[in-house]
């Protein structure tokens, strides 16, 4: 998986990898499909800026809602994008066969799966439709399973990441090269990535791209309230997150708000999930994201350790261009 750099030492320089070639994107940078946050407009902005935007399907009300989002994306960009399918118990009521049917009808070419891999009927339908399937994994074992069932790429999701990080606490600096050692398909590094220096490190470890969640949350195009984004940019650092729900084998990295601290104390005391369910529910987070902006006292935010590297809210284009420039400069330090 040789990474090639073309052009002069300036912004016209382009890093081409197996990911950019296979997906037809300019930059090997993915935007995480953050539930309750990412919408069609944000996906299109990422695509137009040169990366791969990913739409979370699980937070669409139904298949027709998903169709309307896909139509918006196609109105706003002619560049590649992906749709995320998250297979986990909390989303058991999502009618993914209908969602996949809509994706096929609307010409979606790339699917990201997370949680569990797609079951055989869905996977077979995806491959029959000619879709590229990417699976997000937190262990080498799961990555090998994804490869064995026909996934075309995997996201190696280190425990620095926001949201669901698995139960093994493997950081991206170990998980990425381990996946590179064991797999023959392209690897995308996720978890703790926020700048071009880290992107260069990921490429040096053998990855073919990087995956941004927290960095993309703090962008101008992200639809959550400016009050939320500004608060995080001003107050977050590398110590500002905490695991929650480990007792329920659903470990999730969150911004350490007052709500999370209270829920964590209950969890440590041996509470039932029902005792904290309302506090961590997506509908509660939506109220904070779009109505009151109260980060500390209303709902929870999936937030990664990369928050310590993010100090301002900038445009998606600025994120992409600055990361690429810094990555190329960093790699250039090692030119023979």
Predicted regions and their residues:
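Exposed boundary/loop context
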Residues: 1, 17, 25-26, 151, ...
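Short, Lys/Arg-enriched N-terminal segments with co-localized hydrophobic residues
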Residues: 1-10
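Intrinsic disorder/low-complexity signal
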Residues: 6-7, 111, 293
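Active-site entrance/lid segments in N-terminal catalytic domains of soluble metabolic enzymes
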Residues: 11-182
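Acidic, glycine-rich active-site loops and adjacent beta-strand->loop/helix elements
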Residues: 87, 159-160, 192-193, 215-216
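Conserved active-site-proximal phosphate/metal-binding subdomains
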Residues: 166-188, 194-336
């Amino acid at each position: 998986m040789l990474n090639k750099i073309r052009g002069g030492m300036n912004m016209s320089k382009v890093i081409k990898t197996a990911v950019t070639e296979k997906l037809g994107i300019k930059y090997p940078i993915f935007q995480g499909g953050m539930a309750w946050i990412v919408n069609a407009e944000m996906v299109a902005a990422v695509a137009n800026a040169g990366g791969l935007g990913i739409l979370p399907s699980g937070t669409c009300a139904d298949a027709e809602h998903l169709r309307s989002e896909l139509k918006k994306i196609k109105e706003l960009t002619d560049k590649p994008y992906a749709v995320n399918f998250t297979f986990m118990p909390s989303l058991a009521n999502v009618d993914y066969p209908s969602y996949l049917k809509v994706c096929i009808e609307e010409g979606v070419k790339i699917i990201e799966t997370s949680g569990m891999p797609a079951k055989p009927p869905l996977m077979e339908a995806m491959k029959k439709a000619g879709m590229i399937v990417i699976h997000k994994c937190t262990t080498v074992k799961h990555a090998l399973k994804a490869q064995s069932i026909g996934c075309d790429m995997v996201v190696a999701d280190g425990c620095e990441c926001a949201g669901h990080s698995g139960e093994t606490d493997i950081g991206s600096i170990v998980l990425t090269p381990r996946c590179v050692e064991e797999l023959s398909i392209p690897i995308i590094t996720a978890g703790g990535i926020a700048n071009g220096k880290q992107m260069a490190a990921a490429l040096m470890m053998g990855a073919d791209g990087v995956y941004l969640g927290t960095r993309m949350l703090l962008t101008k195009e992200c639809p959550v309230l400016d009050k939320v984004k500004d608060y995080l940019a001003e107050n977050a650092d590398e110590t500002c997150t905490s695991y929650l729900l480990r007792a329920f084998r659903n470990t999730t990295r969150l911004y350490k708000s007052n709500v999370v601290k209270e829920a964590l104390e209950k969890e440590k005391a041996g509470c039932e999930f029902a005792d904290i369910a309302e506090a961590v529910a997506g509908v509660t987070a939506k109220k904070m994201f779009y109505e009151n902006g109260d980060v500390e006292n209303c709902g929870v935010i999936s937030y990664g350790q990369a928050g310590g590297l993010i100090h301002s809210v900038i445009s998606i284009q600025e994120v992409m261009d600055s990361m690429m420039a810094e990555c190329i400069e960093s790699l250039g330090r090692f030119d023979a």
